[in-house]
């Protein structure tokens, strides 16, 4: 049934003689199915003539579209005739099923034609070619499967062997029941061939196989053993099983083995030729599929996707990549001046800053084919696949030129090639990189394929990849500035239902999140919306944004983690020490919030400072940062005369600042104005240092002096303000969370003047105006979060 269905759906008839198709015009060809007058087609007398003729006519007319080749027409006719004589109802079901599949495919083609309406002519032509390639591939697959199915069916039909049996099965299931007709002994193979009577019943079922093989240990005494078994079964002499011997020589066995091997190789060659393993275009073989580049095609002409106006911030980066778009749209402006557009651009920057987003915008704006592929998709465990995929990618790009090729995370294939010094190498990655270098700037390079790549690890890229002529333009996308963060916040806030306008929140949130990437900002906006929905608010409030910022910075409050009274007291004095030192010193940031609620990031409490967009730091500013970080440890020592492990992260920060001041910033008098790069660990954790062991000891000594000086200064600040430290700790134990206004009410204003806080004047004026006018917020516009009124920003 399956073979016949494949025959009907996959093959087409060519010219040449052959048996007449069974449904063609002519005389009736089978009993029980008289021919309908004037048509010569069979019909079933048990069904209504009108309905049957109409349905059968449609089915047979559809089947005529799938005409058979001369090679298999005779086989198909024989199968159909046998099937018809044995079970005509099943034949009708088969024809009806084939008609259903054919009409279903016709409907699917009509749907595809309807979908293609309204598309551009280029898109419709491209879609047509793609469908033709797919249809050709499917036809080749069906032909291959058909050949395999027919060969296996014929071999199975011609073979009468039922497999191997044991001596016990032979005696009890065949010999004792009288099913054995004769046996034939093959001495060279120690095999006995057992031939059964037609229609023999073996193991309780009728068997079509009439020959079984039996392995015998002592072939010379087989006949004697057989006669003894017949005597035990009381078989008469006239009914004894005849035994014959078949001897094959060495050359006969060799010829048989060579012939079977040749037949198998011929079948494999034929299958591989049909499948395209010989390199023919359009092949569907597994190896060809592995060699093909798995890129994503972005069509900017569809009008969908990300445009430059959707990318907030990154003004300089957008200006640089826009030149590629302008060149592809109107190259004559550049060519008439003799200018050459760069061959490629490398987008650099920290994670989450929008490198891939900018590439998506280029894909939409360029209005040319955009082939995107990730770097890790080039490398596989099979050698040579990476280079093959690079060739496949650029071959497709040159066919679609002008075109843009985008490789995301290019560091996966663009790492520096190994040298003889290292002793380690990855040949597959190096071959992939070499092929990429040749395709980007080699003998067959064209000027109409532009390469964009992105990575956040430019330091490990190979120098040949970074040189002019390949990735000759390096676009650095840094963390967004204050203005860029405000634009990014406004872009993400547009999709949220806010209590106020998006510009009402964007400025404060931008000032509250220095050092945040675009991905972090998107995460904050999403967390605020999720929190508002979880709390049942009808719009996103200020408290929701504060919760989102706090969650990103310190994690979610872990209320299930209950601290003992002693631990709560230690944490309260620890965080109060940080807050008090930061409050009393001049060059430290303002304390926004102090909490002793445990967090999911393993922190038992935190003091949230207001960070600043600052790129230059003086020695005094760095020193006071060290003092503020040591405030928790010093507060524990003064309050309890012992220290805990809670200051581990603080000590790590202090150590990093101290060594940076000594080794990189040249701020240690004993070392002088010299700078060394950060330590780079090599193989086995061993790094090469550009300074001597003696200088290392001097730098260690200077760093220890800085840390000791900062700790003494911190202790002095806390000792002079023990009452304020106690007041802050008691307030934390009572409320668990205090903010800027609470601290100012407890210990007074900062001694060096008010700290810089985020309080836009329009926010304060809006709050005062609402209080003066006595406005009442309705539930539809503003629902009080967490059962209370929405708090104002700290002043």
From Swiss-Prot:
Keywords: ATP-binding, Disease variant, Hereditary spastic paraplegia, Hydrolase, Membrane, Metal-binding, Metalloprotease, Mitochondrion, Mitochondrion inner membrane, Neurodegeneration, Nitration, Nucleotide-binding, Osteogenesis imperfecta, Protease, Transit peptide, Transmembrane, Transmembrane helix, Zinc
Needed cofactors: Zn(2+)
A GO MF term: ATP-dependent peptidase activity
Membrane spanning residue stretches: 145-165, 249-269
EC nos: 3.4.24.-, 3.6.-.-
Stretches assigned to the Mitochondrial intermembrane side: 166-248
Gene Ontology biological-process annotations: anterograde axonal transport; mitochondrial outer membrane permeabilization involved in programmed cell death; mitochondrial protein processing; nervous system development; proteolysis; regulation of calcium import into the mitochondrion; regulation of mitochondrial membrane permeability
Propeptide, chain numbering: 44-105
Transit peptide: 1-43
Residue ranges, compositional bias (Basic and acidic residues): 109-133
Top-level EC class: hydrolase
Cofactor note (record): Binds 1 zinc ion per subunit.
Entry binding sites for ATP: 312, 352-357
UniProt effect for mutating residue 650 to H: Might be implicated in the hereditary spastic paraplegia phenotype
General function of this protein: Catalytic component of the m-AAA protease, a protease that plays a key role in proteostasis of inner mitochondrial membrane proteins, and which is essential for axonal and neuron development. SPG7 possesses both ATPase and protease activities: the ATPase activity is required to unfold substrates, threading them into the internal proteolytic cavity for hydrolysis into small peptide fragments.
Protein name: Mitochondrial inner membrane m-AAA protease component paraplegin
Source organism per UniProt: Homo sapiens
């Amino acid at each position: 049934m399956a073979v016949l269905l494949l025959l009907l759906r996959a093959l087409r008839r060519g010219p040449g003689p052959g048996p007449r198709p069974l449904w063609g015009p002519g005389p009736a060809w089978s009993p029980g199915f008289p021919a309908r007058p004037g048509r010569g087609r069979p019909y079933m007398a048990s069904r209504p003539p009108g309905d049957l003729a109409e349905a059968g006519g449609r089915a047979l007319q559809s089947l005529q579209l799938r005409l058979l080749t001369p090679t298999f027409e005779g086989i198909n006719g024989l199968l159909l005739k046998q099937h018809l004589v044995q079970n005509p109802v099943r034949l009708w079901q088969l024809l009806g099923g084939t008609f259903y599949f054919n009409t279903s495919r016709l409907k699917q083609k009509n749907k595809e034609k309807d979908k293609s309406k309204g598309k551009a002519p280029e898109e419709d032509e491209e879609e047509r070619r793609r469908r033709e390639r797919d249809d050709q591939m499917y036809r080749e697959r069906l032909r291959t499967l058909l050949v395999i199915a027919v060969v296996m069916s014929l071999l199975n039909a011609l073979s009468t062997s039922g497999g191997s049996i044991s001596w016990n099965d032979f005696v009890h299931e065949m010999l004792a029941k009288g099913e054995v007709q004769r046996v034939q002994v093959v001495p060279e193979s120690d095999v006995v061939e057992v031939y059964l009577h037609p229609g023999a019943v073996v193991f309780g079922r009728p068997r079509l196989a009439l020959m079984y093989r039996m392995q015998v240990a002592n072939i010379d005494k087989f006949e004697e053993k057989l006669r003894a078994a017949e005597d035990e079964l009381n078989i008469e002499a006239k009914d004894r099983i005849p035994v014959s011997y078949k001897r094959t020589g060495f050359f006969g066995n060799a010829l048989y083995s060579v012939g079977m091997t040749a037949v198998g190789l011929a079948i494999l060659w034929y299958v591989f030729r049909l499948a395209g393993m010989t390199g023919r275009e359009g092949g569907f073989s597994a190896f060809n599929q592995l060699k093909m580049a798995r890129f994503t095609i972005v069509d900017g002409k569809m009008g969908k996707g990300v445009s430059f106006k959707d990318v907030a911030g990154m003004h300089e980066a957008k200006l640089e990549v826009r030149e590629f778009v302008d060149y592809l749209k109107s190259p004559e402006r550049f060519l008439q001046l003799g200018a050459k557009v760069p061959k490629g651009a490398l987008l650099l920057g920290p994670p989450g800053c929008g490198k891939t987003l900018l590439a998506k915008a280029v894909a939409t704006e360029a209005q040319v084919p955009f082939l995107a592929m990730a770097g890790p998709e080039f490398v596989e465990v099979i050698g040579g696949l990476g280079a093959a995929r690079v060739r496949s990618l650029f071959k497709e790009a040159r066919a679609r030129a002008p075109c843009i090729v985008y490789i995301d995370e290019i560091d996966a294939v663009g790492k520096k090639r190994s040298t003889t010094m290292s002793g380690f190498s990855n040949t597959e990655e190096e071959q992939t990189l070499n092929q990429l270098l040749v395709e980007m700037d080699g003998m067959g390079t064209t000027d109409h394929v532009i390469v964009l790549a992105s990575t956040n690890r430019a330091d490990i890229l190979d120098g040949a990849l970074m040189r002019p002529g390949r990735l000759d333009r390096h676009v650095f996308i840094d963390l967004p500035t204050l203005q860029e963060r405000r634009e990014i916040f406004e872009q993400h806030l547009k999709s949220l239902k806010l209590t106020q306008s998006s510009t009402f929140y964007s400025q404060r949130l931008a000032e509250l999140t220095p050092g945040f990437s675009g991905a972090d900002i998107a995460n904050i906006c999403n967390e605020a919306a999720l929190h508002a929905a979880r709390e049942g608010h009808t719009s996103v409030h200020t408290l929701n944004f504060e919760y989102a910022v706090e969650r990103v910075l310190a994690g979610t409050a872990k209320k299930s983690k209950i601290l003992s009274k002693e631990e709560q007291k230690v944490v309260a004095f620890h965080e109060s020490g940080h807050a008090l030192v930061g409050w009393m010193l001049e060059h430290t940031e303002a304390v926004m919030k102090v909490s002793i609620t445990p967090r999911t990031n393993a922190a038992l409490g935190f003091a949230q400072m207001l960070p600043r967009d600052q790129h230059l730091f003086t020695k005094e500013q760095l020193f006071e940062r060290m003092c503020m970080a040591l405030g928790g440890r010093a507060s524990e020592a003064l309050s309890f005369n012992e220290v805990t492990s809670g200051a581990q992260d603080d000590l790590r920060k202090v150590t990093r600042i101290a060594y940076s001041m000594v080794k990189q910033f040249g701020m240690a008098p004993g070392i002088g104005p010299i700078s060394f790069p950060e330590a780079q660990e090599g193989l086995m954790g061993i790094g090469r240092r550009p300074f001597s062991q003696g200088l290392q000891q001097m730098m260690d000594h200077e760093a220890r002096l800085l840390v000791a000086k900062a700790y003494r200064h911190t202790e002095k600040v806390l000792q002079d303000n023990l009452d304020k430290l106690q007041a802050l700790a008691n307030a934390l134990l009572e409320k668990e969370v205090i903010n800027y206004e609470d601290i100012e009410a407890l210990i007074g204003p900062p001694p060096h003047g008010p700290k810089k806080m985020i309080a836009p004047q329009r926010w304060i004026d809006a709050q005062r105006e609402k209080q003066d006018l006595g406005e009442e917020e309705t539930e539809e516009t503003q629902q009080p979060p967490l059962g209370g009124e929405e708090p104002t920003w700290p002043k």
